Amino acid sequence: ASAAPPDSMHSLIIAQAVASSLLADFMTRSSGRGHIHAHDFNRLFVLSPEHELTSSVALRTLRLNCLTDVYADLWEECWDESFLTDTPILERHDERPIGPDWTADTPLRRAEDRRNAQAEIDVMVAMMLGVPIEDLCTIYRTQFAVLYDYDHGRGQGAYVYDANGRQLPTPVRQAWEKRQRPSSNED
């Protein structure tokens, strides 16, 4: 199925979640072209608005994208009371209360919180499409090996976070590695 033109802001947010997902990235990369074209969006997966995970996907997508008050109307139009009971799957360092009105506390701002929310979107989109988690993990490890290494603290651009979820700048991380950083979070 192809992505239908959005009939509301809510469907636009769901389309954005799909477009940002690992599976959509994999599909686009496997086309063999070096660029994304407008017609590629018509080939994106369509998620059922009735699926039990739709609201969770929408919340994470909104919190990743509604960064300033310019997006207040979008946040308010897409607001769902179920957002109040939605809990993150992965750890959040800066989880602040949200409500139907956009505030500066609405977006996820810490690098690790944002990365975790995107990972949750990747998994939920896969679940909504019926893709087994093992297949998603295989795609992640084999087709996105650099991202996999970065997520696991390896490589030139490794994602390493401080105790508050902020990503360490590369020069700081490199200096830390020269001093032989601990090999696990417990260290």
Q: How would you describe each model-predicted region?
A:
Residues A1-D187:
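S-adenosyl-L-methionine
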